Amino acid sequence: MKTTVKHFNELTPEELYGILQLRERVFTFEQRCSEPDLDGFDKVAYHIFLTDENGTEACLRMLPKGVLHDEVSFGRIVAAKRRQGLGEEVVQAALQAAKDVFDADTVEISAQAHARKFYEIMGFVTEGNVYEEAGIEHIKMFRTLKND
């Protein structure tokens, strides 16, 4: 599995297509999100994605501090296959990129509530109550990177 970290402007058409195709499959068809996936933030994001001979297997986008959240954040996390470790692998790559690309001390996410335990295992802590975003319950979570 190859891990790639690129700003939107660096993506090839093939890479962008693979990312958007995977996101569409999950967010539009599986989860039936009530808001459009293409929200304009992809253009300022770094995209972290895992590929193999089958194409894009997992991806997320990372946004600079102050774009959507007070801290560096990531979202649009998708894995083609569940329970294969792909989600953990792409999140670990994002945590490393937060340090390397943004020199971040903290990462903030708006996690889908059903994935809370997944993120807690990865060192995230919750703040506040569950809220609705795009028709899906979410919770604000943070991870400190200082000791990594």
Which positions does each model-derived feature cover?
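Conserved acetyl-CoA-binding loop of GNAT-fold acetyltransferases
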Residues: 120-130
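Glycine-rich phosphate/pyrophosphate-binding loop shared by adenosine-nucleotide-utilizing enzymes
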Residues: 55-59, 72
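Short amphipathic alpha-helix that is part of the acyltransferase structural core
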Residues: 1-47, 51-56
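Conserved GNAT acetyl-CoA-binding A-motif
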Residues: 98-111
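C-terminal "cap" of GNAT-fold acetyltransferases
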Residues: 112, 132-148
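Conserved acetyl-CoA binding element of GNAT-fold acetyltransferases
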Residues: 63, 69-81
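Conserved acetyl-CoA-binding loop-helix of GNAT-fold acetyltransferases
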Residues: 79, 84-96
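Short acidic/glycine-enriched loop/turn segments that link adjacent beta-strands
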Residues: 43-44, 68, 133-137
